[in-house]
Amino acid sequence: MLILKSFVYTVVASFVSLFIFGFLSNDPGRRPGRKRI
């Protein structure tokens, strides 16, 4: 159960990091100066 939970956490963390990286890389080109995080 612990291995399954750690695997799920790893997958979720990788998806979240990919989403944040894609958002930060696509946001300035799409709408510059509109929103900054």
UniProtKB/Swiss-Prot annotation:
Q: How does it sit in the membrane?
A: Single-pass membrane protein
KW Transport (keyword) present: no
Main location group? plastid
The answer to whether keyword Transit peptide applies is no
* Compartment(s) where it occurs, according to its Swiss-Prot or TrEMBL record: Plastid, Chloroplast thylakoid membrane
Q: Which SUPFAM superfamilies match?
A: Photosystem II reaction center protein I, PsbI (SSF161041)
UniProt entry keywords in alphabetical sequence: Chloroplast, Membrane, Photosynthesis, Photosystem II, Plastid, Reaction center, Thylakoid, Transmembrane, Transmembrane helix
- Transmembrane region(s): 1-21
Q: Name one GO biological process term.
A: photosynthesis
- Fetch the InterPro entries from UniProt: PSII_PsbI, PSII_PsbI_sf
A single GO CC term for this protein reads: chloroplast thylakoid membrane
What's the domain of life for this entry?
A: Eukaryota
HAMAP family xref list: PSII_PsbI
Please give the subunit comment from the record: PSII is composed of 1 copy each of membrane proteins PsbA, PsbB, PsbC, PsbD, PsbE, PsbF, PsbH, PsbI, PsbJ, PsbK, PsbL, PsbM, PsbT, PsbY, PsbZ, Psb30/Ycf12, at least 3 peripheral proteins of the oxygen-evolving complex and a large number of cofactors. It forms dimeric complexes.
State the family it belongs to.
Belongs to the PsbI family.
Function, as annotated, reads: One of the components of the core complex of photosystem II (PSII), required for its stability and/or assembly. PSII is a light-driven water:plastoquinone oxidoreductase that uses light energy to abstract electrons from H(2)O, generating O(2) and a proton gradient subsequently used for ATP formation. It consists of a core antenna complex that captures photons, and an electron transfer chain that converts photonic excitation into a charge separation.
Q: What is this protein called?
A: Photosystem II reaction center protein I
Task: Identify the species of origin.
Answer: Bigelowiella natans (Pedinomonas minutissima)
Gene label = psbI
